[in-house]
Amino acid sequence: MPSSSSARSSQSLRSSAAAAVSTSSGAADQPSVPIEILVEHLLAAKRSLSSMTLVLEANDLTTQARSVHEDSVVLAARTAFLRAGIAQQIHTLERIRRGLARTYDVGRRDFEQLIKVLDDAGERLTRTMNVLHNTIVDPVFRPAGEEPRSLMFFVDEGNVDRLTKSLKESIAELKAAETSYDGDLLRFDNDIRSVKKHLLAAPGLPSPSNSVFSRPMADLVRTLTNHSHAMAENLSSLTRHFDLCVTAVRASEGGAALALRKAAEDGPSTISISGVIRGDGTDADDQDIKTMSARERDEMLRVVMQDATEVGEVVRDINSGLEEMQALGALVEQQAAHVRTAHECTLDAFRRLEEVEARLGSYVAAEREYVDRCEVEKDAIHERLAQAEDLVVFYEGYAGAYDGLVLEYERRRNVEDKIRALWRKAAAAVEKLEEQDAAARDSMRKDVGDYIPGDLWVGMDDPVRKWKVVAVDEGEGGSGEIEGSSVRLKKGTVEAARERVHGR
């Protein structure tokens, strides 16, 4: 809006110009004005018209600001649309990332559960192998003179080593797959953070609810337009004042010649008065001047003199108005630059998003590879677990069989001891019968020996038939009769075997 002084000057000049063409009969008579004063006012009015360049510049500023505003509105709309799209894509990427993370978490839980199962199986296998290592074979079951050996000596321990090595390799593969996939997830996270960072780095866009600047650009453009209109009106008033000065000078005797001479002395100017001062006597102004009454001329001179006092103020208003418009134009350009910067930063975020989306396929492929590798290695580990379970069952059966062997040996030895005891009792009974038989024979011999001839006594003096019980080895490679009893097991061997059997 124009300043109050500018408005007053413009209004005063317009009112004076209107009064100059009025022929009101109530106007007071005014004294004549020296021609020199009129010429000075004419030259001052001519110089004031140089403000036309300022008005044109103001118009250019307004036109440019309006164009910049229109471009900024379009660019801001595009930027807002692009930002909304990027934000939606980021949301989609985060959903995909959460899905990939769930796959990783499931694989991680499966891996931890698998490790627990492996630990349990390994602990059971180790416990069983320790039993075999700690169980020394009793010498009764081995050749004489052989050094003591544990049960583990008689089985292939390499199976366990190979199984353990295979399990370690599978676990290492699972760990490598997990590490590789974790690296892919980390890179995906970095990509998403990079897009967010680029988007957040973009300056905010002005909006009615969130004004980045103190004055919206549209308000600045409206103010520039109002200023431009006010300056144009001031220039129009200066132009009418100039025309009125020309008329007053031409209406004064000798005024035209003096004006031309003074204009020449005033130096070169973009505005020439020669064309409007000379006239050719045929135009309407010349006719008006010729028919102008003294009263009308005096009224015209009064208006010229009154307006002349306000020319300087109007020119200053035009200059100050242009300065204010230049400042406003700078603010418009500043906001436009802000919008352009926001758009460029948003484009950077969009380009970064395109790069991330180009790599999205590799992240999804990494998930598939991770799942496949885990399945392969888990199948291999479950197979090894089955083998480990078979080894545990075999080793436990082996240890149990040895304990059964010890108990069986002890049972057989006990049976032999019982048989031996029975045979001892039988031998004692036989010996007693033999003693009784010997006594009976002596008694009979004494009773009938003197009466029976020797021919009838044939064989009666033979000793009673003897019986002998011996142990016989009927096994493979046996040598027939053996003496003595079975070898006893080492002290504590049987008790230890019984404890292990009862503990299973």
Swiss-Prot record:
Compartment(s) where it occurs, according to its Swiss-Prot or TrEMBL record: Cytoplasm; Preautophagosomal structure membrane
InterPro entries recorded: Atg17 (IPR007240), ATG17-like_dom (IPR045326)
GO BP, sorted A to Z: autophagosome assembly; autophagy of mitochondrion; piecemeal microautophagy of the nucleus
Keyword Zinc assigned: no
Chief localisation class: cytoplasm
One GO location term (cellular component): phagophore assembly site membrane
Keyword vocabulary terms for this entry: Autophagy, Cytoplasm, Membrane
Family of this protein: Belongs to the ATG17 family.
Protein name (database record): Autophagy-related protein 17
Record gene name: ATG17
